Amino acid sequence: MQAKKRYFILLSAGSCLALLFYFGGVQFRASRSHSRREEHSGRNGLHQPSPDHFWPRFPDALRPFFPWDQLENEDSSVHISPRQKRDANSSIYKGKKCRMESCFDFTLCKKNGFKVYVYPQQKGEKIAESYQNILAAIEGSRFYTSDPSQACLFVLSLDTLDRDQLSPQYVHNLRSKVQSLHLWNNGRNHLIFNLYSGTWPDYTEDVGFDIGQAMLAKASISTENFRPNFDVSIPLFSKDHPRTGGERGFLKFNTIPPLRKYMLVFKGKRYLTGIGSDTRNALYHVHNGEDVLLLTTCKHGKDWQKHKDSRCDRDNTEYEKYDYREMLHNATFCLVPRGRRLGSFRFLEALQAACVPVMLSNGWELPFSEVINWNQAAVIGDERLLLQIPSTIRSIHQDKILALRQQTQFLWEAYFSSVEKIVLTTLEIIQDRIFKHISRNSLIWNKHPGGLFVLPQYSSYLGDFPYYYANLGLKPPSKFTAVIHAVTPLVSQSQPVLKLLVAAAKSQYCAQIIVLWNCDKPLPAKHRWPATAVPVIVIEGESKVMSSRFLPYDNIITDAVLSLDEDTVLSTTEVDFAFTVWQSFPERIVGYPARSHFWDNSKERWGYTSKWTNDYSMVLTGAAIYHKYYHYLYSHYLPASLKNMVDQLANCEDILMNFLVSAVTKLPPIKVTQKKQYKETMMGQTSRASRWADPDHFAQRQSCMNTFASWFGYMPLIHSQMRLDPVLFKDQVSILRKKYRDIERL
């Protein structure tokens, strides 16, 4: 029986092969004879009908998106062949094969680290406001150097942002101006910023001069012309984009379910002719007037009526019915189709509004795609599959929509809300390429707080930062180092600093105590310090300035730091409770003395208050616990100008630390217990600690608030009404049931 089956299968296979060979041979002979007939007719001047002539011609089953014959008649020069397009693109960059290994000199960076030099501005050269903001962001960063011999990267002062020849911002004769720069060196180790390139009708990515071996930080760059790990794709931003700070995202709270009034929206220009018109002319097929609103208008450009079609009047009327901002804030998804160029202002607008972008721009290298995983924040569509977009986004689960929306807010606030953040992200990406052994990984770039606040020079291990304990499955540190800032001489054994030292040393969580001696008097003898169960290390400050208390000392062996002023009054129980609270919030400042900020309408400036109200926004570092990483961030991230101000005033260092931590975490600090008085009131009036009684001290702190807010570009401090007390605090139960029973008596 089995043999019969095998024979039958073999016979069937043989028959199929024979039929295939027969029909294939017939077609092959037919094609050869047809080619011979064509050759013969060509020699005799005769015309033979092609085989296609015998096939029936069916009418178009689908209506085209646009009357192509009309479009061709209006401007046939717009349509160029693929070969012409390839030739145009290939001539854009002569250094198209450039990579970091072949077109970048790493030796310049190994000498002095990653330093950026900006060419001095030339007389008579006009610079647009957007490019001035870019240069100001570089010059205000920690990477800037005014000495070209120390530079690793060079940035032109010549405005290269707008290279559209029809633009009033276009800089003429840029080729000769760049070549005349004595440090140009064929563009090696140079970075060129560009937002607009090419012009009507094809809008190629030609910047109008030979960039040589320079890197491009470019908007609307195509994947075809993008040089991986060499160029940087940046977003297209308007001239009104804030230089620093920027507005926060518009998502104030999460709605469950995360669906809004409209499923998908878009409102913009409809290009009747030319590049970018194909997709926008087809949007009306998807628009349903209910939860999918894709509105376009023909009213743009000087001669729009010349190209007006039969649908323009209806589109223009529908376009005027809806307010764009209202649509943006009430939509779940926002369509981001390409314009004349690949990039669009709609991209950043959607991110800020927490409207999940639906990208419809084939071939666009998305901004910072080298480090950002856009699949976590956007839907990547295909222009050729426009009609499938509604069904695709409707199939996305609500949990996924919520995650996408939250990620848009993180990315907006971390990398896109200001020109400064866009520039610094560009520089950090280049720095990671140069120093690959300490570069940031994808988790750092795509998780809070982002790559700008996580400095890999501090550590290459994520567990050394306070933000990734949950991701790594780690527990917060179990010990702390107490750092006591001493500014008065040790003259009595009853001084508050000695009582404080003993109280901190008795804590079960204390690993060691460091006394930072910032006093003008010599160090006291070792026998003057009380005996403790933990090591006591006395460090004499070299410069003896206020900022020295936040230096990243190697002697600090724990991740947790208990920062104390010498006149602070705390018990061991209070220290223990504050530390256990901090273990639940390791990225925040946790402590006792709370202060607040407010906006003074009469003076139009920020104010500082120590009054006890129902909320607070700062916890002073005279009695607070925080992560050691903030010492490194304070010393290496903040500009020298702010730290010099603190040192000159001998004031405001605690406010500056609160500004920094709130800017990183986007969260307020945490106050513990209801304790109000944390200072020793009997300190001598000749002591430097008596600065709190100085009438100028409070006025200085008011001034500091506004200076710090100006540098950050916004007010990072956040008000909170939360206070954490021990369980059963002041409850009418037995005192034996309470762990921190002593706190109620303090």
Swiss-Prot record:
Residues binding a protein: 166, 203, 300
Membrane side Lumenal: residue ranges: 29-746
Coiled-coil ranges from the UniProt annotation: none
Top EC group: transferase
Transmembrane feature ranges: 8-28
Protein EC: 2.4.1.225
Primary site of residence: Golgi
Membrane topology: Single-pass type II membrane protein
Gene Ontology MF term list: glucuronosyl-N-acetylglucosaminyl-proteoglycan 4-alpha-N-acetylglucosaminyltransferase activity; glycosyltransferase activity; metal ion binding; N-acetylglucosaminyl-proteoglycan 4-beta-glucuronosyltransferase activity; protein heterodimerization activity; protein homodimerization activity
Keywords in alphabetical order: Disulfide bond, Endoplasmic reticulum, Glycoprotein, Glycosyltransferase, Golgi apparatus, Manganese, Membrane, Metal-binding, Signal-anchor, Transferase, Transmembrane, Transmembrane helix
Protein's recorded name: Exostosin-1
Native organism: Mus musculus
Lineage: Eukaryota, Metazoa, Chordata, Craniata, Vertebrata
